[in-house]
């Protein structure tokens, strides 16, 4: 991040203060204990399984198929080259800022999230994913890109994909499960295409600029919703009895305030990395100030899980950027509490009252989850090994047998949903995938600098932050959040490969 003169002054004053020295002495025993934890030592070990996976039969088959496709495109390109070499389309695309792969990919991702819910169709993402994959392979075949084999995304990624496909065998409603599997396939393609195509910080800059634009546009629209009273207090979204005075919760272009909060938690750290690494100090400050808009929008969602997730993401971001600023971060967070509007304080206190019952009334959303999870526990007991298949239809076919809460369409927890839908294999492979991704990002940041380093920190922060929301929300029920999650994963892989180029090298 670009620190100005004033910020540098306060920073130096802080790290040389007596109070900071005392905090360092208090922290040192905890740091030593952390370094000696068995789990930490395990995460720091090398990845032997990946080496075995890359030489496996499955990996060789996938490479063979991709090589055949690329050779086919290469032959077609060679045959047609004389005809289109001087064509108008080629002349327009050559050197164009707009008519190139990165611009089109970023523009679609931006459009995906700024399009209002009533106009969006998940089929757009499926068609776009297939189109971008085809275009990428054409570029590889014509020699414009270097092919990245899917095994570079890691064995856990492939294992999770296999678990999703195998879940079809045990599905309670195969047609609906197939529909959801198509959404996952599109999400995986976005991950692969982003990881494969992004080769340098300049390309990442383009993509992040579009993501920043999407976050800003949706934030401004959310503020407009509140300003012009386009949203109203809804008893189905908020317990109005203990949340008195809470206004309507903004949804922006998404369908639900929690969905929008999850989108912001996933992408705001990326926006912070994008803004904070601008070389021009004026643009850096302007872009950082712009983050006030999505922060305000997140507050207006009144999503308690979203608030906690973003605070956790911010804590991780500061931790990985500069641990010495952690006490200052905590102090500023505590000092901000007295200045919070009463409606926000009311909403935050319901977190405590929901679990302790100190107000004599448990929040209806918390009560709903507790009752639902009790029934889900029995469903997992009976179907947790193989799963019941993807999609709400499979859940709906079994839920009446377990006396679940009326109107429940999913488990209200990402982790419960993964076990129930995909079984143990799906849950373990997903957790392995994300933990490995976080581990690789933290390690890779030590070798990176500039935008790539900031981005690795931001991706780690986003994944850790959203992990809290996964406890009390099923993020992927709304497909655009599913796409956002795996777009973030693709950006993470791309940044890891840039920090460690040999990890992306083809065999």
Task: Identify the residue ranges that each predicted region occupies.
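Transmembrane signal-anchor hairpin modules in multi-pass inner-membrane enzymes, especially those
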Residues: 1-166, 172-176, 202-205, 209, ...
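Alpha-helical transmembrane segments of multi-pass inner-membrane proteins
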Residues: 108-109, 162-166, 189, 205-246, ...
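Hydrophobic core segments of transmembrane alpha-helices in multi-pass, intramembrane catalytic enzymes
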Residues: 124-134, 179-191, 258-274, 305-317, ...
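Transmembrane alpha-helices of multi-pass inner-membrane enzymes
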Residues: 130-135, 436, 451, 459-507
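Structural signal for the C-terminal ends of transmembrane alpha-helices
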Residues: 134-146, 193-202, 272-279, 315-323, ...
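Aromatic-anchored transmembrane helix interface
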Residues: 152-160, 174-196, 205-215, 262
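A membrane-periplasm/extracellular boundary helix in multi-pass inner-membrane enzymes
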Residues: 220, 226-229, 318-360, 364, ...
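Long extracytoplasmic/lumenal interhelical loops at the membrane interface
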Residues: 232, 246, 359-374, 378, ...
């Amino acid at each position: 991040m670009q620190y100005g003169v004033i910020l540098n002054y306060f920073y130096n004053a802080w790290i040389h203060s007596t109070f900071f020295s005392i905090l360092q002495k208090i922290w040192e025993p905890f740091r030593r204990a952390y370094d000696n934890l068995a789990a930490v030592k395990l995460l720091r070990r090398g990845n032997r399984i990946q080496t075995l996976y890359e030489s496996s039969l499955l990996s060789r088959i996938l490479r063979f198929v991709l090589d055949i496709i690329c050779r086919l495109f290469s032959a077609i390109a060679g045959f047609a080259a004389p005809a289109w070499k001087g064509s108008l389309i080629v002349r327009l695309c050559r050197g164009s800022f707009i008519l190139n792969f990165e611009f089109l990919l970023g523009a679609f991702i931006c459009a995906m999230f700024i399009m209002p819910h009533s106009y969006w169709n998940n089929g757009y993402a499926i068609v776009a994913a297939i189109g971008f994959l085809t275009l990428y392979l054409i570029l590889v075949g014509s020699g414009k890109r270097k092919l990245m084999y899917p095994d570079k995304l890691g064995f856990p990624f492939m294992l999770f994909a296999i678990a999703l496909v195998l879940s079809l065998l045990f599905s309670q409603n195969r047609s609906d499960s197939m529909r959801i599997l198509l959404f996952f396939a599109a999400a995986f393609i976005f991950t692969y295409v982003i990881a494969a195509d992004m080769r340098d910080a300049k390309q990442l800059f383009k993509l992040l600029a579009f993501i920043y634009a999407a976050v800003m546009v949706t934030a401004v629209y959310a503020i407009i919703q509140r300003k012009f009273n386009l949203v109203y207090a809804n008893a189905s979204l908020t317990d109005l009895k203990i949340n008195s005075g809470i206004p309507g919760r903004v949804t922006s272009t998404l369908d639900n305030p929690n969905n929008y909060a999850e989108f912001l938690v996933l992408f705001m750290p990326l926006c912070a990395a994008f803004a904070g690494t601008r070389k021009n100090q004026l643009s850096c400050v302007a872009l950082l100030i712009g983050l006030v808009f999505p922060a305000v929008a997140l507050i207006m969602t009144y999503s308690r899980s979203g608030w906690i997730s973003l605070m956790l993401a911010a804590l991780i971001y500061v931790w990985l950027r500069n641990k010495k600023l952690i006490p200052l971060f905590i102090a500023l967070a505590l000092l901000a509490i007295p200045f919070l509007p009463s409606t926000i304080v009311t909403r935050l206190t319901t977190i405590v009252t929901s679990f302790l019952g100190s107000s004599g009334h448990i929040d209806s959303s918390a009560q709903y989850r507790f009752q639902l999870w009790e029934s889900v526990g029995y469903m997992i007991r009976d179907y947790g090994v193989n799963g019941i298949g993807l999609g709400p239809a499979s859940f709906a076919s079994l839920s009446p047998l377990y006396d679940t809460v009326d109107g429940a369409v999913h488990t209200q927890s990402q982790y419960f949903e993964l076990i129930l839908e995909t079984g143990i294999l799906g849950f373990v492979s997903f957790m392995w995938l994300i933990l490995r991704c976080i581990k690789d990002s933290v390690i890779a940041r030590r070798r990176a600098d500039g935008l790539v380093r900031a981005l690795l920190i931001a991706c780690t922060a986003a994944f850790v932050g959203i992990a809290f929301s996964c406890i009390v929300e099923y993020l992927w029920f709304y497909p655009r959040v599913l796409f956002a999650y795996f777009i973030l994963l693709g950006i993470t892989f791309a940044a890891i490969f840039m920090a460690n180029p040999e990890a992306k090298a083809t065999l």
